[in-house]
Amino acid sequence: MTKALAAIVGSGNIGTDLMYKLLRSEIIEPRWMIGVDPESEGLKRAADRGVIASAEGVDWLLARDERPDIVFEATSAYVHRANAPRYRELGIQAVDLTPAALGPAVVPAVNMGEHRTAPNVNLITCGGQATIPMVHAVSRITDVAYAEIVASVASPSAGPGTRANIDEFTITTSRGIETIGGAKKGKAIIILNPAEPPMFMKDTVFCSIPADADRDAITASIHDVAASVQAYVPGYRLRAEPQFDDPTPISRGLARVGIFLEVEGAGDFLPPYSGNLDIMTAAATKVGESFATQILGASV
């Protein structure tokens, strides 16, 4: 079967975990793994799996006679901002796993169909990938005046990049809750959970809804969208049934629905408690396969 060719740029934990997922894809061939450190564990693992591994960076990749159809960038925002124009000039679609956010934000279960031909898409944040689908599930049934999410991730799964960009996480995720999730106002909070042993990613979503909203329809929509996410993130699950609260004197006449999630990683390379990272590589794979379907269809 013909497959779209892909390169992973960035041989760290994210890039390596992504490689294992792409190796299972029926329509993407991860042909290249690109890094800058010859001693990288990711490059060694790539070579062991038959993936062409190079520590000579993007210059080396783009100088090849054969080039990828899709690039997955798992480096840094700074590096991706430099590389993105070069990919675009060569007609290579880019899936951005960095905070650069140069292209439209994509959550596969919500808006992938709108961006299949985009030259560059970004995946927002791990908290956004986990919680925006739930806000969308509610907002497609009724108005959501306000949505607030709390993402709790195991402290060992949060590297220096995450810790240095907490403000960026909250701003970017809050924006996605509004623009993709459909809430009129969104707020995001992240907690680095120091518990030992490390716990799975846990997310809480609260949505303010009209007092007369159809609660059965909202519950059904939540389960439907959760199943859509679970199709590409098997460890994504509801921890309990959605909980509804009636209006109170301080809620301005609005009711509330609470949604409680857990994300367990697949354990491809990262430990299962790193569900926050696994949901990013799983979403990247799903987006890449959507790109590949478009690319292969156009080449027939």
From Swiss-Prot:
Belongs to the acetaldehyde dehydrogenase family. GO terms for molecular function: acetaldehyde dehydrogenase (acetylating) activity; NAD binding. NCBIfam families: ac_ald_DH_ac, PRK08300.1. Pfam families: AcetDehyd-dimer. This is Acetaldehyde dehydrogenase 5. Keywords: Aromatic hydrocarbons catabolism, NAD, Oxidoreductase. It catalyses: acetaldehyde + NAD(+) + CoA = acetyl-CoA + NADH + H(+). NAD(+) binds at S11, G12, N13, I14, S157, A158, G159, P160, G161, T162, R163, A164, N165, N276. It comes from Rhodococcus opacus (strain B4). Its EC number is 1.2.1.10. InterPro entries: Acetaldehyde_dehydrogenase, Acetylaldehyde_DH_C, NAD(P)-bd_dom_sf, Semialdehyde_DH_NAD-bd. The keyword Oxidoreductase applies. GO terms for biological process: catabolic process. It is an enzyme of class 1 (oxidoreductase). It comes from the Bacteria. The active site is at C126 (acyl-thioester intermediate).
